[in-house]
Amino acid sequence: MTYPQQRLLTVDILNFKCYQHHKSFGPFDHVTTFIGMNGCGKSIMIEAIAFVFGEDLPDPKNPHNEHLFYDYNIRCVVSLKFEMPDGSTKRFTRIGLKTTYTYMIFNKYVTEEEYLLELGKMNFRFAGQNISVYNKTTLKVTRKSAEELGAFFDIVSNSIEFKPEYDELKAKLNFAESTVLRWAKMIDSIELEKEKFITLTLYKLYLCDKEIQETKEKFVAEQLKVNAKNAKMPLRISRYSEAIPKQTPSPNFKNNAIVVRPKTHNHYDNLITVDKLNSYLNEKVTERRELLQFAVNHPNMNIRFSEEGPNIYAREIDYTELPEYYKKESDDIIATSYKRSMLEKEIKKIRQCWLDENNIKDDANIDNINMRIKEATTKHTLALNIESEARLNWEKLRVMRSARFNNFMAPLQTSLSRIYAEIAQDEDSLAFLRPLDEEEPYLAIDAFVKERHSEHISTRTFHGGSRMIVDLALIFAIHEWKPSPLVVIDDIDRNLYHEASKKIEPYLSRQKQTQFIVTTKEDSYFTEVTKTITLEN
């Protein structure tokens, strides 16, 4: 019989889990089957082999290694003895202590790096899962989600070597993208603020114009009242006025109006006459209408309100000596003028309320907003450059990682289709893998099967023996990609019916360059072409 280049001869176990004292298994044949019911130690023996190949077998309830020891022992020892192509033997031993491990090759202590390096020279790669297969993990490889299957193949293909740098560059890219998005939103926010500012300014001008128009109508009504009162005054008021000495007018007499205003004992200085108020209101209405049109045409210009009117030169007339009848008429005129003064103050108050309610400061203008937009645009452009550089670096690494992953997937696809058809003994049967993302295939992989006269079906919908055959076909395809001298399969008959086991057995016997160790509960499975070892409870 042809044997692999390296062949496992014996397994020696001391105080490992359920095995007390020293326990030896072997020698092993090309295909060796362990038969026994649940609880006889089949799976523990498989775990012992995996322990030698470097698996930690962690227990989430016990952070130390006590879960590896039998009862109250303080250490466990597992040793594998191999026969080399030249006929010599090599022994690998791993010793588990309470918080650490020690390693031996032959009878010499070595470091963990030297130990794993020597195993690697014999093509034992536990990270690739091509040595040991467990009934709770790897044997159910196709039952994983698409993301879990992608992560599993990422480990097997060793494209996971790029993952730390990939994740770092991806984080930088995501941060750069979020920065670009943040500044873009900031620009949009300032642009919206600009539109609101312009709209609010125009609306303020509209309200101001409307309020002035209403106030003007009130003033006109007041003027009519004053004119009516003045019409009743006798002509001798005019004669009395002529008897009072005239004051010298301003040097700019021709350019200024002379207004006669009363001088009473209360000394109301600087009273606004009806003519001046009318003129002032008309100027304000005209000014605001022009400002409204100018703001529409030039929304980025500052808005300024002028409160100054034309200079008025007046002469004072003393009405204190007039009779009471005339004094009453004069007091009515003064009271009306006072009302106008209060109305003007009300206009100023309304204008200030508009400014306060809309939170518009006097120095707020379009130029300030445009400056903020310019600053935000500059930072947005800088963020775009950083994002472009981060994307370029990430893209280079993504291409390298995808290339290594695809170099693994291409031969795996071919092997999977062939092995599945061989095990199923149906040339029309087809099993294949499909990445969910072609640019980043390592993120998610889904497995499909196409039987005769059927559509493509996801393997996650399979049950029983059909699913087990797909699992084994995929495991054998992974092993064929980079074969190791030994493959261990625990509970190979799980969910297999007798006819399916008869399909698996011939395939194992044809793999002359690989040694197989399998466990089963059924003594009628895998017995025709293999060496059997029965384990008792």
Swiss-Prot record:
Family per similarity comment: Belongs to the SMC family.
Family matches, as InterPro entries: P-loop_NTPase, RecF/RecN/SMC_N
Expression by tissue: Expressed in the germline.
Pfam families, per the entry: SMC_N (PF02463)
The keyword Cytoplasm is assigned to this record: no
UniProt keyword Cell cycle, yes or no: yes
GO biological process: cell division; sister chromatid cohesion
Gene (name only): smcl-1
Record GO cellular component, one term: cohesin complex
Function: Acts as a modulator of condensin function, possibly by binding to the condensin SMC subunits and thereby inhibiting their function. Negatively regulates the condensin I complex in mitotic chromosome segregation. Negatively regulates the condensin I-like dosage compensation complex, which functions in the regulation of X chromosome-linked gene transcription, by limiting the association of the complex with the X chromosomes.
Protein name (Swiss-Prot/TrEMBL): Structural maintenance of chromosomes-like protein 1
Signal peptide: none
